[in-house]
Amino acid sequence: MLIGLFPELDAPGGVQRAGRHLAAVLTEFAGSRGLECRILSLNDKAELKRLNVTGRDIVFTGSERAKGNFLAAALKTARRAAAKGKKAPKLVVAGHPNLAPVVRAMRLITPRLKTIVCTHGVEVWQPLPRVRRNALQKADLVLAPSRYTAEHVSADQGVDSGKVRVLPWALDPQFEALAVHAAKSALPARFPQGQVVLTVGRWRADERYKGMDTLITALPRLLPRWPELQLVAVGDGDDRAWLEDLAEETGVDRHVHFLSGLSYAELAACYGHCEFFALPSRGEGFGLVYLEAMACGKPVIGGAHGGAPEVIEDGKTGYVVPHGDAAQLATAMETLLDDATLRAEMGRRGKQRVENEFKFSVFAKSFRRMLRELCES
């Protein structure tokens, strides 16, 4: 029996998208071996739900943020797995380290249960609370989307490095299909005219590490040469008003545009019509938005921190700059704005890199190999 535990599946966000990809491969792997598969979600609605992910249907049950109900469902599923017999494969995949204690409790009921816990980035760059850290250490495998995060899993969480594996997240296949025609797709009505720099994220006060404020403060260095330059920020959050005030104080409010509530096709069109993408963050464990921009053939500017330098090849597919350094960010932006040939070449290299290393098929093959390894051990 294969079991998947996830914080949330039917919602936007990088953690949610990675969870859907994990659940899709887990479901497909179980089906290929004639095994029962049960998927549980903490935050989704308390109902049986079906989602089509990468052409595969995943069926899961939510707990509507009721932690007690989620734990009870997980333990009930563990008892069901225990009843399958000694020889039947039993494996649970947790899509976030916060769920590691639940996995540990399930293993007390089903000692033969193999366990995988997935990490994402900033949440494991500092020591976790003791209970979570101890539970993470007991997992058979701990997955990280970048070498940087994998190193923190060992150094800060005390997980044996032999149990830590790097599994980069993948470009969503639905977005991959949209990226093919992104440059010709219809734009949202509020997308501005002129040369556009695009950024995408959640603009929350507790996530100012994304670097949106630095993008705003870099604009005055660029506008004298490119007076029609526009910064489009896709996404929303409780920090949007603060960022809008910052743009006004900086004197660039006419050049900063927030777009939210876009469809996937409209998002792809935004990528397709920008000059380049920029998110100078210091807290990306991987950075799925970088993959989306690269898939649309666009150069990328990211932060020289976290997992971003493992996605962006500095000087080849874009640039990485220190977080908070508006001068270095402006220099990288100037270099790209100055040279259309360079933008095209970097975009071509980035698109090829996604094709070779970050397609869903590459992710699925690697994850299936890990599942097979544990099921057969």
Each language-model region and where it sits:
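Nucleotide-activated donor-binding/catalytic signature segment of Leloir-type glycosyltransferases, i.e.
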Residues: 241-262
